Amino acid sequence: MKARGCGSGGGPGSGQPRIEHRAGPSSGPGRSASTKQNTAGASPARNAARAARVDALVKKIGFLSFGHWSSSPGSHTRSASDALLQSIDLAVAAEELGADGAYFRVHHFARQLGSPFPLLAAVGARTSRIEIGTAVIDMRYENPLYMAEDAGAADLISGGRLQLGISRGSPEQVIDGWRYFGYQPQEGQTDADMARGHAQVLLEVLRGEGFAQPNPRPMFPNPPGLLRLEPHSQGLRERIWWGAASQRTATWAAELGLNLQSSTLINNESDKPFHLQQAEQIQAFRDAWRTAGHEREPRVSVSRSIFALVDDRDRAYFGRQNQDTDQIGFIDATTQAIFGRTYAAEPDVLIQQLKEDEAIAAADTLLLTVPSQLGVDYNAHVIDSILTHVAPALGWR
């Protein structure tokens, strides 16, 4: 039986889903203006230092949808078909608005997106620039070889735009749901060990090296040597992310050369505010990355629930949701988690609040969690409000 996934890190917020993404080389208005000012009367070294500071502010901004559907009053996604088709339409709209990423959360045994690769392939076929990804797929449920084939196909359809977030997964709708998919931790293993083992197999086969002994009398002619999985998409291995809830797993991800996704909740590992704990997790990841000696620079994304109140609809939906404190609770019998606040305010207030968020500052990618049940038009408005009224003032654009 095939396996699909869910993941670590989600978002409370609006009673519906939330989002996150990174910085790229494109030169938005803030970047080009700063670069122009820096070139006059300054040394090349000083110009380079200033440009580096500007680049550090620029962020890729995408959305993260949990893909809920329900027949509750006011829901625009009343069926699985609605949720899937509107997810595609929102990705198209986000690309037209200038957003950088369309990401989807995966959950099993729930009225949410459970099988991401058909959706990712469809989004890839309908768009041309935007990154498409997951945040995250639960590797406890996954056959890593079949997953590599699905991911390779989706990546090729999109022209190499897949950003695949995977993780150990979060508490599920059912008890030990992976058992129904045919998986069971080996003796002495935890389900987290099993998930990390599946992830390591996935990373190995994504390298594209042959490992399977060919049949001497095959149905079709084989190339020489051991055979690899097909279709293989070159470069996908470098676009795998790990959704880490703790500093320990963030360090593990860095050692393996995975990018980092950190969401709207993480393990509560100190008495510090959420954004500071998350910033420390990111720093631990970057330190471990440097120690590992990887040649490329890693990417880091954080997810946030951010709503700019620019019209009466915004105030009606989110005017009372500006939670100025973090929340702490148990996500299972033993794990205490800290949930990040929801940002909902007028743009000028939001700008000041977001300047203080050290984890956002440390990330190159911001994913905005969206209330998908409110429909494509409203969610496009939510994304556009951040891109237009907030991001430029913070140097993100």
PLM regions: where:
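N-terminal beta1-alpha1-beta2 module of alpha/beta enzyme domains
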Residues: 47-130
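Compositionally biased, low-complexity flexible segments
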Residues: 2-49
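Alpha-helix-loop-beta-strand connector modules within alpha/beta enzyme cores
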Residues: 113-137, 384-396
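An alpha-helical appendage that flanks or caps ligand/catalytic pockets
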Residues: 50-57, 185-229, 262-263, 270-364, ...
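Conserved, mostly hydrophobic/aromatic
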Residues: 61, 98, 106, 123, ...
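Glycine-rich, proline-tolerant flexible connector loops at the mouths of alpha/beta enzymes
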Residues: 101-123, 264-275, 367-380
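Flexible, glycine-rich active-site loops centered on histidine and acidic residues
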Residues: 58-80, 141-211, 268
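Hydrophobic faces of well-ordered beta-strands that scaffold small-molecule active sites
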Residues: 61-65, 102-104, 132-135, 162-166, ...
